[in-house]
């Protein structure tokens, strides 16, 4: 993984962490692009059960910086409330009611999607908060496209 490439990497945490803490836990030289906040798995610490994780993408500005996570969160919860998948889902409805009015900084984050140069992910190796990681798309770094992080 630590060759001259860029990658997207999904990280699952050992427990939920507030967004404000997640921001401090992650290296500054990777891009935080998606927050995993809910799944139908009762005890996430036991590992994936094949259920889909629910979360939302973070909007980025022209400098690849997160610029309006509150709006992103609000749109996510509005979409969940309208989803037929959540209409009869008691646990899902409970999650919505407990979290939709929280500020992003206080949301329980179970995992994240990150992008960046593969060498920058090395800082996450052996971190106790990382329960698991999954490498998604990778691409070689080429001279005519410079990664921002």
Predicted regions and their residues:
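Extracytoplasmic/luminal low-complexity segments enriched in Pro/Gly and acidic/polar residues
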Residues: 89-149
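Extracytoplasmic
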Residues: 4-8, 30-35, 107-111, 130
């Amino acid at each position: 993984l630590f060759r001259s490439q860029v990658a997207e990497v999904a990280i699952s945490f050992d427990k939920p962490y507030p967004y404000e803490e997640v921001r401090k836990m992650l290296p500054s030289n990777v891009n935080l692009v998606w927050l995993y906040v809910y799944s139908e798995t009762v005890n996430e610490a036991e590992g994936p059960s094949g259920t889909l994780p629910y979360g939302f993408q973070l909007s980025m500005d022209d400098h690849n910086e997160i610029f309006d996570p509150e709006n992103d969160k609000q749109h996510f919860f509005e979409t969940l409330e309208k989803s037929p998948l959540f209409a009869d889902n008691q646990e899902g409805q409970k999650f919505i009611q407990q979290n939709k009015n929280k500020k992003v900084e206080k949301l329980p984050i179970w995992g994240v999607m990150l992008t960046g140069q593969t060498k920058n992910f090395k800082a996450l190796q052996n971190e106790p908060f990382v329960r698991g990681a999954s490498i998604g798309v990778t691409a070689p770094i080429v001279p005519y496209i410079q990664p921002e992080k």
